[in-house]
């Protein structure tokens, strides 16, 4: 998952920077690493709210083991420990979800707040919380009291990014955990950002050409009918606030809060396991940087034992192992959001919108923004039958077009209860029953017990009367409206398949022409193809599964070679290369020869991997830049952004689309074709490599172009010089198509923007089945020994065993412990 990389769309202290400052997963400590801001790892401390003593031990990663004689005390302690490790993350996510970042960050965050108020996650969270059982509400209440125990005890020792802002944190409410869940759900949705980007592209090219920029999958037809929805509409400067909306949506994507692109999970059935028991692997991916949003926890209490993955702010184990069942999640890339273009008429303060030829009054309510350093602002949010009119600027809707966002409602949703019940499920059969109740979030849930494996798609998917949801629909025409939701019993699932494995890597997981519309925003197919190659290649065990998670071989390279050698391409491409000027001709021939010999292994030290990626980058520019450029233009940024979230026109054109109009370079008098542009791209790859890596082509290395930047995303840390917050940059291999995912911006730069944030493997044949690893650190506080301490083990693949048997706790966690006692 992703979830989950800061691109530079604004100056350092613009809205993106302001948001990053307080969503930064690394707390900032002014004046040095103050140990007083860190939870102790040993000693005895009273804590009001506990009924009995609780023990907290830490392993080498910093993962806490919470041992308690009651589930109440375990949840209370989880809230306390989450806050101690990640309070900056928790408060930043809450403020973002509420649309209140400007209270801490000032006016620079106001546009983000405007968008988030109109999205109204607070209402979604309220619906989820109100629909939860009394039992679940009690759990959230106890957890909140644990968070508040931390906020009270450390009220004068909070991380400096909070303290220096002057912001006084409010106490945590039980509903706030539902709000964090709603933000996670929002972050998994790529549709808002993709539809905005598509609309930006529609302003640049005609509807006839637009479909070529919106491919959905290699074997799917281009969406010409979908693009026809926009024919006859004057989009240029007619959509209120579109440029601001797109800018803020891109920033949210960069903050890992919109359109988390990647995650992989798979399960191996006993017949394909070397030791005759199931295996489950989970690879949860996020934008690169400090720190991963994911963290580990282990809880041992009467009738509840679980180890797994959490997000601070929620008392739920989202992926994990309970001693009998292992479960994991990845992003379906489900399409459950739609933008609607609304015809707007403004008369004074009254706003109307058109429905089937009639003007209807838009509902309105006031929002107040308490901006740090400024006066309170009151602004009006308008709502149509589809949803709120999105706004990311001070410009109110006027006569023309505005955008409304429709999302499912969750008034009867039991997802929060279902996640808790899943963590207690004893087997795959029960996991199916509980996961079908998860409707608020679109996930590929894969689970395993010792003898069985299963896969279930969760979520709530709208039935559209017409349209595919790729582009905003005319809201004034009811034929594009939603007509209820797909029955959850129709959601795709599988159990114990004959092939002996199940896998989800953001690819299209359903056959072409499947009976319900799950999505048209699928990721690239190559990671899933590689899982299939390896899973079918022999018996699997823990060692081979670790190798799979670190695999850097792309199947796209072989497809590229097949395209070069295709009967209709081989000869024309040779002729196009021969027609180049001599210097370019020699470069193109060298690039072609080396790419044809390339084995697809994208290791950091590979010269041919560097050339391969240079070719991918240059081909995107040669194909599209003449019509969508310059590289700073909104259209080009939209193309790059969509390529980072789903299957792209860059890939689609390389492997096919020989008749696309984009093969012609409109800046030349002649008409180019695909072979001509490919020949230019081959030569340009060498030219670019010479500039970036030097003239000794054998000495090129992919890792010299492609790096993991272990840097805090907080501009406050940058303002202080980085220093204690950052951990430098390291060469890395892979790309967006490899299992060890390391995506870059296709058409922009080479730095890694997406990386696995946490890995988990459960091998049921082992005495202690669970192992795991986090990419950065358990803590977001640089003063903690568990801040960024996992980078080196991560790079070396040094997994940590996570014991579930009590007699093995000392080996996994040591003897040192923090004892929390009931306070008065």
Swiss-Prot record:
The keyword DNA-binding does not apply. Its EC number is 3.5.1.97. Keywords: Hydrolase, Periplasm, Quorum sensing, Signal, Zymogen. It is an enzyme of class 3 (hydrolase). GO terms for biological process: antibiotic biosynthetic process; quorum sensing. Its main location: periplasm. It is found in: Periplasm. InterPro entries: Ntn_hydrolases_N (IPR029055), Pen/GL7ACA/AHL_acylase (IPR014395), Penicillin_amidase_A-knob (IPR043147), Penicillin_amidase_dom1 (IPR023343), Penicillin_amidase_N_B-knob (IPR043146), S45 (IPR002692). GO terms for molecular function: hydrolase activity, acting on carbon-nitrogen (but not peptide) bonds, in linear amides. One of its GO terms (cellular component) is periplasmic space. The active site is at 264 (nucleophile). It comes from the Bacteria. The keyword Signal applies. Residues 1-26 form the signal peptide. Gene3D superfamilies: 1.10.1400.10, 2.30.120.10, Glutamine Phosphoribosylpyrophosphate, subunit 1, domain 1 (3.60.20.10), Penicillin Amidohydrolase, domain 1 (1.10.439.10). It catalyses: an N-acyl-L-homoserine lactone + H2O = L-homoserine lactone + a carboxylate. Catalyzes the deacylation of acyl-homoserine lactone (AHL or acyl-HSL), releasing homoserine lactone (HSL) and the corresponding fatty acid. Possesses a specificity for the degradation of long-chain acyl-HSLs (side chains of seven or more carbons in length). Heterodimer of an alpha subunit and a beta subunit processed from the same precursor. Belongs to the peptidase S45 family. AHL-mediated signaling mediates quorum sensing in many species of Proteobacteria, regulating hundreds of genes, including many that code for extracellular virulence factors. This is Acyl-homoserine lactone acylase QuiP. It comes from Pseudomonas syringae pv. syringae (strain B728a). The gene is quiP.
